[in-house]
């Protein structure tokens, strides 16, 4: 049976991931870093906007012109991902110490305060009786309203975190946004080809004597992937 595309349900958001954009040129398709999960997704709202022009004459409307000029989106989560903040806001995560003395810090400084470009993809499972799942993909985004989160005391409810961004077309192919329906459920794809690897934070212990066992506490390694 063919998928029914006339009555798409919008229920059961299951996954939202973001991937930092590495490159976007007029000669090649964009490349992205490995996806980061925005855990605890509550909602993913996509809002295309139109520029409208109306031609008047003889005391009446003679014509109208409309064109999609921007696509805005808002994501709300029940928990905060430091790795997600690093992708959408910039900044840097650093680790220090080990075991009980371990400390993890996300920091935004004046030098890294420009939000990077990223891709965002959301997946929901209840899309229709003949549809396995549905995905929304925005290929080149930048935050327009940074994450806003509230921490309540024990008498209140759990806080949440939300941010708003704007999507724009990629340079070579003009990919902007896609709504993808799958006959069978598919997870958000994670690129399988590792193209590079870098050490973001060295291990706590870097000097050894002959015969000592390596200790990797504190080591943070980041890989770049290609579709």
Q: What annotation goes with each model-predicted range?
A:
Residues 1-45, 190:
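Polar/acidic, low-complexity leader/linker segments enriched in S/T/G and N/D
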């Amino acid at each position: 049976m063919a998928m029914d595309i006339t009555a798409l349900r919008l229920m059961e958001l299951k996954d939202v991931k973001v991937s930092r954009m590495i490159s976007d040129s007029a000669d090649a398709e964009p490349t992205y870093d490995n996806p980061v999960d925005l855990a605890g997704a509550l909602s993913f709202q996509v809002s295309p906007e139109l520029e409208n022009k109306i031609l008047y004459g003889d005391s009446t409307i003679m014509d109208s012109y409309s064109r999609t000029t921007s696509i805005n989106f808002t994501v709300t989560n029940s928990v905060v991902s430091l790795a997600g903040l690093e992708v959408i806001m910039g900044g840097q995560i650093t680790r220090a110490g080990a075991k009980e003395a371990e400390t993890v810090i996300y920091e935004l400084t004046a030098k890294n305060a420009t939000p990077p470009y990223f891709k965002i993809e959301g997946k929901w499972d209840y899309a229709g009786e003949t549809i396995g799942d549905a995905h929304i993909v925005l290929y080149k985004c930048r935050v327009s309203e940074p994450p806003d989160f509230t921490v309540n005391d024990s008498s209140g409810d759990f806080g949440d975190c939300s941010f708003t961004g704007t999507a724009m077309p990629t340079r070579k192919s003009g990919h902007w946004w896609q709504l993808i329906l799958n006959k069978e459920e598919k997870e958000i794809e994670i690129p399988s080809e590792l193209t590079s690897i870098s050490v973001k934070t060295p291990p706590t212990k870097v000097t050894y004597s002959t015969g000592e066992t390596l200790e990797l506490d504190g080591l943070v390694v980041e890989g770049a992937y290609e579709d």
